[in-house]
């Protein structure tokens, strides 16, 4: 009787150990604070994976920039310090200039998943950085220029930037400096509020949503149309970690990512409309470029970014071999007309 009881206990312990071992864990960090809408979107994705992956795979979020600095996160996932990162591709642009195809895109993840664009970006990530590009989240949202003071225009309707203390970053500096001729002040997102408060900057590029989350609307009074660019927020996974997961775990995570690409497009467009309404009600004014000035503004945003991409690609192994294909997959010239 004792032997049977012991045997049963051992069998039960083995079963429990097997079940515990079967549930794999992916550690993750995100680039922005939890209060920002984009981070909330990523955490929603995590919740979906953890629900679908019960007993198989779970994502363990370790935090945001307070855990690993936002600009150090791409190296951290490449080096295996963390398994997964949600971050703009622009934060590792020096290693992967092809991310500019997403920045200059007028398509969303839905179209580029279907046409092979994301598959190509994934392939390039694996080749250049040893990373699995899991998905392009929160696409379909573009950028505006936001200013404290009323914008000025020249006789031809072009935006005048002389005297503007414009905050810049890696996403839009090629456009701001090479076309607008602006002198930019590079600042990470977390430092912009205090810079606006102290008058260090009085204008910034930012996406159509999130201004209220960051409380920058306390200082910014004008939105300049048209919007330009696209968000390039994506999830990357250390390739060794990805390949070590079971086939079932990989399928769960990838399937949820593809669905979240679709869901986030609609969710963030609704959030954009909500934010615009709230900003307008609080007194935010909208000014717009028109005619040739508008067309030239949009063309420059696109072409200066492509120019930057091609230049940096040409300096790296593999050169510009994927350049034309990236533009073909991530930009619809007919839609731009």
Ranges and model annotations:
Residues 12, 23-111, 131-337:
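N-terminal secretory/targeting leader peptides
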Residues 108-128:
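A gly/proline- and charged-residue-enriched helix-loop-helix capping module
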């Amino acid at each position: 009787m004792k032997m049977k009881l012991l045997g049963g206990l051992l069998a039960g312990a083995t079963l429990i150990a097997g079940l515990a071992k079967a549930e794999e864990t992916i550690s993750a960090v995100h680039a922005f604070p939890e209060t920002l809408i984009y981070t909330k979107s990523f955490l929603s994705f995590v919740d979906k994976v953890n629900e679908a992956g019960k007993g198989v795979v779970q994502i363990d979020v370790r935090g945001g920039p307070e855990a690993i600095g936002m600009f150090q996160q791409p190296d951290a996932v490449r080096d295996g310090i963390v398994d997964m990162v949600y971050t703009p591709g622009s934060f590792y642009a020096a290693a992967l200039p092809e991310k500019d195809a997403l920045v200059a895109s007028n398509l969303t993840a839905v179209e580029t998943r279907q046409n092979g664009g994301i598959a190509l970006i994934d392939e390039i990530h694996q080749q250049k950085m040893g990373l699995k590009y899991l998905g392009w989240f929160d696409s379909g949202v573009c950028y505006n220029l936001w200013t404290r003071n009323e914008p000025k225009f020249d006789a031809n309707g072009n935006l005048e930037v002389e005297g503007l203390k414009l905050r810049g970053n890696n996403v839009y500096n090629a456009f701001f400096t090479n076309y607008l001729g602006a002198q930019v002040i590079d600042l990470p997102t977390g430092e912009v509020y205090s810079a606006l408060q102290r008058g260090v900057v009085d204008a910034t590029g930012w996406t159509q949503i999130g201004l209220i989350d960051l409380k920058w609307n306390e200082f910014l009074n004008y939105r300049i149309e048209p919007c330009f660019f696209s968000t390039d927020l994506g999830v990357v996974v250390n390739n060794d970690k990805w390949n070590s997961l079971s086939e079932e775990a990989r399928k769960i995570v990838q399937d949820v990512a593809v669905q979240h690409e679709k869901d986030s497009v609609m969710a963030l467009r609704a959030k954009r409309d909500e934010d615009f309404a709230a900003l307008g009600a609080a007194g935010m004014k909208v000014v717009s470029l028109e005619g040739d000035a508008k067309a030239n503004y949009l063309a420059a945003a696109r072409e200066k970014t492509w120019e930057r991409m091609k230049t940096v690609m040409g300096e790296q192994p593999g050169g510009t071999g994927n350049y034309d294909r990236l533009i073909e997959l991530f930009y619809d010239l007919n839609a731009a007309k």
